[in-house]
Amino acid sequence: MLTTGLQPSIAAGRLVFARVSASRGADLFHMRLPQAGADPGTPQGLQESPANDVDPALSPDGTLLAYSLGNQGNTEVILRTYPAATDRWQVSSGGGASPVWSPRGDALYYRTISGPIMRVDVRKTATVTLGTPRLVQRPSRLVARVGYDVSPDGKRLLMVEEITGDGGRGTSVTVAQNWFAAFRK
């Protein structure tokens, strides 16, 4: 096993994840992904603070890290340089969580506290410039904490929403085993 933690994000040969402890809350850790057969080493603390740091999302090129920072009942999406935190920007205002990068790394999506998904353009030159948050989608209710992602072509949001109006019966899942053998017949 490489390590234990929650909400892994992988890019550019690096792994960033959250760990929860009873004494500190949630903190972010990171490590280099090992080559086959090599010792993975020990995860290092990346973002350790009294606040809860969760939902890490590495940019596709591995130079920026977005995450949710929970402090005294308020959660915001933060963007910082990676691995060294030389610069830091607040992406959301009025509450935000669950950041997800576009495949090209030119936009960051996040959920507001009330549910809508926002998009912020990210321009990287000598510095990082953030655009104005724009409403993208108002999902009825996402099933998981993150519960959405951006399609590989960057043109669509893919999400898992709760089905409403089923009278509380829940959702059934059908598992088809050995379907390929049946298909060949």
PLM feature spans:
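Multi-bladed beta-propeller domains
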Residues: M1-L6, M31-V54, L79-A97, V122-V143, ...
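Beta-strand C-termini and the immediately following turn/loop, strongest in propeller blades
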Residues: A12-S23, F29-P34, Q47, A57-P60, ...
